[in-house]
Curated annotation (Swiss-Prot):
Sequence intervals crossing the membrane: 33-53, 77-98, 113-133, 178-198, 226-246, 288-308, 320-340, 347-367
Organism of derivation: Galago senegalensis (Northern lesser bushbaby)
Pfam families referenced in this protein's UniProt entry, alphabetically: Cytochrom_B_C, Cytochrome_B
GO cellular component entries: mitochondrial inner membrane; respiratory chain complex III
Recorded name of the encoding gene: MT-CYB
Additional remark text: Heme 1 (or BL or b562) is low-potential and absorbs at about 562 nm, and heme 2 (or BH or b566) is high-potential and absorbs at about 566 nm.
Gene Ontology molecular function: metal ion binding; ubiquinol-cytochrome-c reductase activity
Annotated protein name in UniProt: Cytochrome b
Obligatory cofactor(s): heme b
């Protein structure tokens, strides 16, 4: 058996990636989220495949086909809710994974980090297009509002929006192409995840201390396979608890109303995992400025390795940076809350303040604190 594992071309590749992979001996449970993201992606692809067997991407039948899945298809309701809440779990793991990378300085592995940012954008695009498919009120108006943002691009904006729509409004052509893209993108995400792992295994994993662990490595299996299994069990228990007890907790009630182009919902908002970016978008009165702030709020991750002025990789021994980091986390929670509130005072002011703080911490306060901590090291 060992010979096959180490000699067969395909088995050898799997062996080097998941079995005999040398891993640092001190990585904590924060390193579990990579494998949990892989599990989430598998759940999404499998449940999505079964949903696609019964779904019809036509404006006249899309809403009723989702109803049919929930009412008439064997276990259709659980497949649908696993898929919808699986997306929420995906983003929870994704935010934890990125947060871990920021805290422990994993962004110094440039290729891995940059592929990760591309993955984040791809997952966000996939989730957005998936939200449009049930063709409820929030699906339709969410698609209209978000795609309309592209019209802020000078000269070519309006033409670009109509090209994406396939007409002069969000209609059948839009729904059909969104379904096609929503189906193909998870497989592209899986391929990008392989590249992400490929680059990670070039450098080896980071560890909480942020110093080289070359002198103290242990095999990935059985130590970290067992450790990951605990994360898997916790994730599945959380997901099934959500699906079986309160499947609509994270959804929007407006999406149970069929899409009506003549009736605008009182508050148009995306799914909870986009609310932080949506709050930043809304905090700027100018349309183009808002779009630039929205893109910058995520693209700013690409700047972080270049703004890293500290002499230590990890924040483990940098208390001032830790304070700023947790301020940033609190700020993101505030933005998420504001994104779900109506556009009126005091929410407008809170949103604008939180948006300024977000960019201020990442672009100015973090690099300056790093330099200060470098000075304190010499004391």
């Amino acid at each position: 058996m060992t010979n096959i594992r180490k000699q067969h071309p395909l088995a050898k590749m799997i062996n080097h990636s998941f079995i005999d992979l040398p891993a640092p001996s001190n990585i904590s449970s924060w390193w579990n989220f990579g494998s949990l993201l892989g599990l989430c992606l598998m759940i999404q692809i499998i449940t999505g495949l079964f949903l696609a067997m019964h779904y019809t991407s036509d404006t006249s039948t899309a809403f009723s086909s989702v109803t049919h899945i929930c009412r008439d298809v064997n276990y259709g309701w659980i497949i649908r809710y696993l898929h919808a809440n699986g997306a929420s779990m995906f983003f929870i793991c994704l935010f934890m994974h990125i947060g871990r990378g920021l805290y422990y300085g994993s962004f110094t592995f440039l290729e891995t980090w940059n592929i990760g940012i591309i993955l984040l954008f791809t997952v966000m695009a996939t989730a957005f297009m998936g939200y449009v498919l049930p063709w409820g009120q929030m699906s339709f108006w969410g698609a209209t509002v978000i795609t309309n943002l592209l019209s802020a691009i000078p000269y070519m904006g309006t033409g670009l929006v109509e090209w994406i729509w396939g007409g002069f409004s969000v209609d059948k052509a839009t729904l059909t192409r969104f379904f096609a893209f929503h189906f193909i993108l998870p497989f592209i995400i899986a391929a990008l995840a392989m590249i992400h792992l490929l680059f990670l295994h070039e450098t080896g994993s980071n560890n909480p201390s942020g110093i080289s662990s070359d002198s103290d490595k242990i095999p990935f299996h059985p130590y970290y396979t067992i450790k990951d299994l605990l994360g898997v069990i916790l994730l599945l228990v959380s997901l099934f608890s959500l699906v079986l007890f309160s499947p609509d907790l994270l959804g929007d009630p407006d999406n149970y109303i069929p899409a009506n182009p003549l009736n605008t919902p009182p508050h148009i908002k995306p799914e909870w995992y986009f609310l932080f970016a949506y709050a930043i978008l809304r905090s700027i009165p100018n349309k183009l400025g808002g779009v630039l702030a929205l893109v910058s709020s995520i693209l700013i991750l690409a700047l972080i390795p270049h703004l890293h002025t500290a002499k230590q990789q990890s924040m483990m021994f940098r208390p001032l940076s830790q304070c700023l980091y947790w301020m940033l986390v609190a700020d993101l929670f505030t933005l998420t809350w504001i994104g779900g509130q109506p556009v009126e005072n005091p929410f407008i002011t809170i949103g604008q303040t939180a948006s300024i703080i977000y960019f201020l911490i990442i672009l100015i306060l973090m690099p300056l604190t790093n330099l200060l901590e470098n000075k304190l090291l010499k004391w």
